[in-house]
Amino acid sequence: MNKFARHFLPLSLRVRFLLATAGVVLVLSLAYGIVALVGYSVSFDKTTFRLLRGESNLFYTLAKWENNKISVELPENLDMQSPTMTLIYDETGKLLWTQRNIPWLIKSIQPEWLKTNGFHEIETNVDATSTLLSEDHSAQEKLKEVREDDDDAEMTHSVAVNIYPATTRMPQLTIVVVDTIPIELKRSYMVWSWFVYVLAANLLLVIPLLWIAAWWSLRPIEALAREVRELEDHHREMLNPETTRELTSLVRNLNQLLKSERERYNKYRTTLTDLTHSLKTPLAVLQSTLRSLRNEKMSVSKAEPVMLEQISRISQQIGYYLHRASMRGSGVLLSRELHPVAPLLDNLISALNKVYQRKGVNISMDISPEISFVGEQNDFVEVMGNVLDNACKYCLEFVEISARQTDDHLHIFVEDDGPGIPHSKRSLVFDRGQRADTLRPGQGVGLAVAREITEQYAGQIIASDSLLGGARMEVVFGRQHPTQKEE
């Protein structure tokens, strides 16, 4: 069973459609055929009885009663509607006249039939029927074919009984008219054969039409399956929303799922990129410290605190970015804590001095101790670390830091004496992967990360010209009131 199911189940939609419609066509064809056969049979019986009764009336008209005997004179030019055998009885059931003397037929007429008008049938065999058809060569040929197929086949003859009351010229008579051609040799017996042929032809014609209908009807599903394969092969990003009404909801939900998955993938990829970038500074400090140890410019006792601090910084950054990845896009600030700005910047300056020790960068800071940052400490460190690292990288020697605070905003200014940022590129440097100077190493990530974080605080970063001759970065943090509720 499992092997069968594996090879044949589940059936495709096209096969299901074809089987279902073919079954419906078959059932309807059988039902219509049976109804037609029943209707034909009833109609055939009524028509046969009417014809036989007409011939009975004809024989009654042609009959003459003389000397207590009955005689029937048939005109030579009389055209009988169908070959029949007529028998005339008196009111006691005595046979008075018959067209031909066929003993088995006379014995087959039941006495009770003669008591009322009615329609009856006589069951006989092929040989007996042959005696009735002795003068009908066409019917004899058909009967011969039946005998060749089945020598024991039963034949059915229709019998009409009509009673005529006594008149002044004629006593009461009962006329029995027997149809000499059996029902099996009439066209009615071919109805079943025709029905089988019509049913077979119907299926042979309908199935190809159903296949075409199924192919046309299921084209949207085939198109959807093809688009899904293209998605798997990375040849498209979304499903085509222009589809049939029945599939619109499915396609819309799938596209929404694809969009959500892509956004989640991009979020984690961006977070991983940001984490990698944020680890550059502590790793550079560790590298510089190890180099100093190797060159014996620093003792182990002095290097150990520096290295432990940077390792702790790396651990904090990893935890920070994992948390940030889960909160990205939620619009919720991680904290409303108050942090003095000067100590945070002192730690960053100390780390950057180690990174750019060979370059001899001179970083100065003029910030009042009262100035504080409201929010997540790691957010502030990440933003200012990227901005200061960018300034140290492009300066010639000097970097200056200043700040001012209003009721709801914190402004921090970072200026350097480097080449500055051209006006045409000042908006581009905050986009991921965009850099004003492509000759120096970098990925164009730091300022983009800084801008994203400041935007979470309803802030911004503004690039302009510095009095030192280089670039001036104004970092603005909003939502700086300690009691302000998060939006």
Curated annotation (Swiss-Prot):
Binding site for Mg(2+): N386, Q443
Binding site for a divalent metal cation: D151, D152
Side Cytoplasmic, residues: 1-16, 215-487
InterPro entries noted in UniProt: HAMP_dom, HATPase_C_sf, His_kinase_dom, HisK_dim/P_sf, PhoQ_Sensor, PhoQ_Sensor_sf, Sig_transdc_His_kin-like_C, TCS_sensor_his_kinase
Residue ranges annotated for the HAMP domain, each copy included: 215-266
Binding-site residues for ATP, renumbered to this chain: 386-394, 416-421, 435-447
Keywords for this protein: ATP-binding, Cell inner membrane, Cell membrane, Growth regulation, Hydrolase, Kinase, Magnesium, Membrane, Metal-binding, Nucleotide-binding, Phosphoprotein, Protein phosphatase, Transferase, Transmembrane, Transmembrane helix, Two-component regulatory system, Virulence
EC number: 2.7.13.3, 3.1.3.-
Catalytic activity: ATP + protein L-histidine = ADP + protein N-phospho-L-histidine
Main location: membrane
Pfam family, one: HATPase_c
Top-rank taxon, per record: Bacteria
Sites marked Plays a critical role in the switching between kinase and phosphatase states: N202
Localization of this protein: Cell inner membrane
Ranges facing Periplasmic side: 38-193
Transmembrane segments: 17-37, 194-214
Subunit structure: Homodimer.
Purpose: Member of the two-component regulatory system PhoP/PhoQ which regulates the expression of genes involved in virulence and resistance to host defense antimicrobial peptides. In low periplasmic Mg(2+), PhoQ functions as a membrane-associated protein kinase that undergoes autophosphorylation and subsequently transfers the phosphate to PhoP, which results in the expression of PhoP-activated genes (PAG) and repression of PhoP-repressed genes (PRG).
UniProt name for this protein: Virulence sensor histidine kinase PhoQ
Gene behind this protein: phoQ
